[in-house]
Amino acid sequence: MPFFGNTFSPKKTPPRKSASLSNLHSLDRSTREVELGLEYGSPTMNLAGQSLKFENGQWIAETGVSGGVDRREVQRLRRRNQQLEEENNLLRLKVDILLDMLSESTAESHLMEKELDELRISRKRK
């Protein structure tokens, strides 16, 4: 039996009102654009005097020149960068192979020296 009367019972909250009575949320994007003129286009920004536009997941310069560098020059530099990365990978592979060959020849020379020392010792005993 509780000391202070009835057990705790909060009063019931009133039901929520409908958030929106308009049917805009039920319209698809193309219908909204036609009916309401909500054609936003792709996002654009101006950064350091350069106008950029977001298309297909990438920011692209709207003008042909990007910060004083031509698009063809950028593509050429990217291709050259790719070639240099591939050459770098090939050279790393060659260095690894040469290190393996060096360690193998070093191990063989140590074995030969050991056998030679054993032969010298056995020859002195006879």
Swiss-Prot record:
Organism of provenance: Homo sapiens (Human)
CC annotations in GO: centriole; centrosome; ciliary basal body; cytosol; nuclear speck; nucleolus; nucleoplasm; nucleus
Known tissue expression: Widely expressed. Expressed at higher levels in heart, skeletal muscle, kidney and placenta. Also found in brain, lung, liver and testis. Significantly down-regulated in thyroid and metastatic uterine tumors.
Record has DNA-binding as a keyword: no
Keyword Cell inner membrane found: no
GO biological process, any: canonical Wnt signaling pathway
Cross-referenced InterPro entries: Chibby_fam
Gene (UniProt): CBY1
Family: Belongs to the chibby family.
GO terms, molecular function: beta-catenin binding; identical protein binding; protein homodimerization activity
Segments for region (Disordered): 1-26
Name of the protein described by the UniProt record: Protein chibby homolog 1
UniProt-reported outcome of changing L91A: No effect homodimerization, nuclear localization and interaction with CTNNB1 but a slight reduction in interaction with KPNA4
Quaternary structure note: Homodimer. Homodimerization is essential for nuclear localization and interaction with KPNA4 but is dispensable for interaction with CTNNB1. Interacts with polycystin-2/PKD2 and GM130. Interacts with the C-terminal region of CTNNB1. Interacts (C-terminus) with TCIM (C-terminus), TCIM competes with CTNNB1 for the interaction with CBY1. Interacts with FAM92A; this interaction facilitates targeting of FAM92A to cilium basal body. Interacts with CIBAR2. Interacts with KPNA4.
Coiled-coil region: 67-125
PANTHER family according to UniProt: LEUCINE-RICH PROTEIN (PTHR21533), PROTEIN CHIBBY HOMOLOG 1 (PTHR21533:SF20)
Biased composition (Polar residues): 1-10
Miscellaneous note of the record: 'Chibby' is Japanese for 'small'; the gene was so named for the RNAi phenotype seen in flies.
Main function: Inhibits the Wnt/Wingless pathway by binding to CTNNB1/beta-catenin and inhibiting beta-catenin-mediated transcriptional activation through competition with TCF/LEF transcription factors. Has also been shown to play a role in regulating the intracellular trafficking of polycystin-2/PKD2 and possibly of other intracellular proteins. Promotes adipocyte and cardiomyocyte differentiation.
Modified positions (Phosphoserine) in chain numbering: S9, S20
Outcome when changing L98A: No effect on its homodimerization. Loss of homodimerization
